[in-house]
Structures are given as structure tokens and as C-alpha cells.
Amino acid sequence: MQTPIIGFTGQLICLRALGQEDLPLLHSWENDPDGWLSNGTVNPLSKDFIQSYISASTRHILETGSMSLIIEKLGSKEAVGHLVLYDYTPIHRRLAVGVYIDSHHRMQGFGSEAIGLATRYAFEKLRCDQVYAEVLAYNSHSQHMLSSLGFQHTATLPRWHWWDSRYEDLYYYQKWNE
């Protein structure tokens, strides 16, 4: 079992690196059709593909521009979600963040705390000037969560994402290190 990363512990959760023991859970989450709209997946992912993803996640964020973490509930060490930091560009000092919370653990503050910890890490350790998130228009829960964390809705890409016989607008939310 992986150990929490120093500085990645909140009141409800801690964040830790992905490990081989996470393969069944990540395979289940990545193949949940309810999550496909948010993450852009259009087909099931194999265990081999997820295995490669886990192996690649050990590389440094400066090398890959991304970092994937498991969200664990404090006390129980139960994995409740997956946090991804991506599109890290040191020259522009910005980073994107995305979160997936297991359906049994939503609306309990885990996603909000994970985004908060990731934002603090981006500002304090990576010296980012901004953190941003992409949210589809239908996802009002994520929009509210980001707004409550100080993110601002700064852009809309109309009819950006095709899903289930319709287009969805894509919203950009940004938070600056001020």
C-alpha cells in the first residue's frame, strides 16, 4: 500500500501515488460509462492500458506534465477517488486539475478538498500562477464546487463536446495565485 504524500493531507482525505493495487479500482472507474462524458472517454479501457498508465504515473511531473493521485478517506484508507494534475507548463506557470469521485462517495466534500490540496501544491511547490479546470455545462455540482474554492468561470466553448445525440458546452474555470 502506498503512503500519503507529505503536504497532501486534509481534514477528510489524503492523496497518495498510484500503485499496482489500484488496478482493479481504476479499471472500474475508467470504464464507468457515467464518467465518460466528463473525461472524454468513448470506449472501454483494457487492464493492460490502465497498467501502463499506473506505471507511467511514477515519472516526475516536470518530465511528463502530469501527476495522478489516489484520494483516500482518512481513517479508513479507503480509495474514494482519483485526482489528475495535467497540462503542467512551467514556462507559463499553469496547471489543469481534474477529479473523479466514486459514486458511493460523492457530495461528501472529498472532491472539494482534493482540488484544494492540489491547488495549494500547484501554488506553493510548483510556483504556478494559475490552476484551471474544464467542466461540461451539465455538471452544475462541479461548477458550484470550483466557485466555492475561488475559481472563476472565465470562458465558454460552445457546442464543444458531442455526447448522446447532443453537444455540450465546455466551461473553463481558473484560479490565480494572488
Which residue stretches match the model-derived regions?
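A generic secondary-structure signal
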Residues: 56-57, 121
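Acyl-donor (CoA/ACP) binding surface of acyl/acetyltransferases
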Residues: 1-24, 30-32, 72-178
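Conserved GNAT-fold acetyl-CoA-binding loop/helix
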Residues: 34-56
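A short helix-loop-beta-strand connector motif used in the catalytic cores of GNAT acetyltransferases and
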Residues: 57-70
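A general structural signal marking secondary-structure boundaries and capping sites
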Residues: 33-34, 61
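Sparse recognition of residues in long alpha-helices and their boundaries
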Residues: 42-43, 66, 162
